Amino acid sequence: EAGEECDCGTPENPCCDAAT
């Protein structure tokens, strides 16, 4: 939910890490 608004295009994205 935290990474829904974030663009998970890069594995180094801190937002993507929180979305997993």
From Swiss-Prot:
Entry comment describing in which tissues the protein is expressed: Expressed by the venom gland.
Keywords (A to Z) from UniProt: Cell adhesion impairing toxin, Disulfide bond, Hemostasis impairing toxin, Platelet aggregation inhibiting toxin, Secreted, Toxin
Entry GO CC: extracellular region
One of the record's GO molecular function terms: toxin activity
Residue span, Disintegrin domain: 1-20
Localization: Secreted
Further details from the record: The disintegrin belongs to the medium disintegrin subfamily.
Sequence similarity: Belongs to the venom metalloproteinase (M12B) family. P-II subfamily. P-IIa sub-subfamily.
Subunit description: Monomer.
Function (record text): Inhibits fibrinogen interaction with platelets. Acts by binding to alpha-IIb/beta-3 (ITGA2B/ITGB3) on the platelet surface and inhibits aggregation induced by ADP, thrombin, platelet-activating factor and collagen.
Protein name (database record): Disintegrin
Organism: Bothrops fonsecai
